[in-house]
Amino acid sequence: MEGLVPGRIVYFVFDAGRAAEAQRRRTSSQSILARMKATTPAVEGGAPAIVAWPAGAQAHIGNEVKAGDIYPAMVLRVWGESGCSNLKVMLDGSDEYWATSINFDAAKAQGSWHWMFDGQQKRYDPTAVKV
């Protein structure tokens, strides 16, 4: 596919399954605070108290991802001439989503990628040499 090379930025359209997958890893600051306060008491002469969320643990926090949402994504790998690609989707939060084997669809169907604007694929020629 013309102009499709690793490093290009395109748009990815979430479908319900991928949105749920991205959302499953996310939490909120309120949820973290509640879990940090929740502990399982220590057993006398046995196991120590267990904190539901250890201080310093990494969390993925951000706005909700839903089916139909469109996010910018960087092309990581291109699989042949059809436009099927692996993408790193930049979410609205502290994390990103790795979308694999995503097909191009000019109609912008859910679960596909498309160019950000008409003609984008022709605006950059990585083979052009400037002296």
Region spans (language model):
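Short, charged beta-turn/beta-strand-edge "cap" motif at the junction between a beta-strand
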Residues: 1-3, 8-9, 13-20
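Low-complexity, intrinsically disordered short peptide segments enriched in small/polar/basic residues
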Residues: 6, 10, 47-48, 58, ...
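Short beta-strand-centered aromatic/proline hotspots
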Residues: 21-34, 55-57, 63-79
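Intrinsically disordered, low-complexity regions
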Residues: 29-33, 47, 99, 126-128
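Long intrinsically disordered, low-complexity regions that are acidic and Ser/Thr-rich
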Residues: 31-55
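Intrinsically disordered, low-complexity, charged/polar segments
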Residues: 61-71, 76-131
